[in-house]
């Protein structure tokens, strides 16, 4: 697996930012230390994804699901990460439901994107017309009420 990591990397700026946020302000780290962290992260990701793939294969699944990753973490004895990751998964699923609801609202309308755009443009036109009409008629109303 270590040989495979020559072809992939983690974004150095992202890793640098993560390390900087974790370290005390008075601590520094070298580029070599950052490279070791990057390579360790890559190796961890490769091991975890390989184990999760194995878990999916054992269930005759062709897609790795979050449950497979969690089982892989258990198998690798990283149980302390699981509650945190399950919370992240719940938050992600919640945000996906909101997105799906928004997306399905337009799909359920039965209208094409072009038709929806045309309706939106018409609503804008009507709104501008009302705004223009109100701004023209308001001075007259204020003169009448004097």
Curated annotation (Swiss-Prot):
| Entry keyword Phosphoprotein | yes
Q: Known CDD domains for this protein?
A: HFD_Dr1
InterPro entries referenced in this protein's UniProt entry, alphabetically = CBFA_NFYB_domain, Histone-fold, Ncb2
Note down the stretches annotated as region Disordered: 124-146
Provide the alphabetized UniProt keywords: Activator, Nucleus, Phosphoprotein, Repressor, Transcription, Transcription regulation
State the superkingdom. Eukaryota
Q: Which GO terms describe its molecular function?
A: chromatin binding; core promoter sequence-specific DNA binding; protein heterodimerization activity; RNA polymerase II general transcription initiation factor activity; transcription corepressor activity
In the record, Phosphoserine modifications are located at 135, 137, 142
Q: Where in the cell is it found?
A: Nucleus
Q: What Gene Ontology cellular component terms go with this record? A: negative cofactor 2 complex; nucleus
**Entry annotated with the keyword Repressor:** yes
Q: Name one GO biological process term.
A: RNA polymerase II preinitiation complex assembly
Task: Cite the record's note on assembly.
Answer: Component of the NC2 (negative cofactor 2) complex composed of BUR6 and NCB2. The NC2 complex associates with SPT15/TBP. Interacts with SPT15/TBP.
The entry's other comment says: Present with 2950 molecules/cell in log phase SD medium.
Function text: Component of the NC2 complex which represses RNA polymerase II transcription through binding to SPT15/TBP and thereby inhibiting the assembly of the preinitiation complex. The NC2 complex may also mediate transcriptional activation from TATA-driven promoters through association with SPT15/TBP.
Name of the protein: Negative cofactor 2 complex subunit beta
């Amino acid at each position: 697996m270590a040989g495979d990591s020559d072809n992939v990397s983690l974004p150095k700026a992202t890793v640098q930012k993560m390390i900087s946020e974790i370290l005390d302000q008075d601590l520094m780290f070298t580029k070599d230390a950052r490279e070791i962290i990057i390579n360790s992260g890559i190796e961890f990701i490769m091991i975890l994804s390989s184990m999760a793939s194995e878990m999916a294969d054992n269930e005759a699944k062709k897609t790795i699901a979050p449950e497979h990753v969690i089982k892989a973490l258990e198998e690798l004895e990283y149980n302390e990460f699981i509650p945190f990751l399950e919370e992240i998964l719940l938050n992600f699923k919640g945000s996906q439901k909101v997105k799906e609801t928004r997306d399905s609202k337009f799909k359920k309308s039965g209208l094409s994107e072009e038709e929806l755009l045309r309706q939106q443009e018409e609503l804008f036109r009507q709104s501008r017309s009302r705004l223009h009409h109100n701004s023209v008629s308001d001075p007259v109303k204020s003169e009448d009420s004097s």
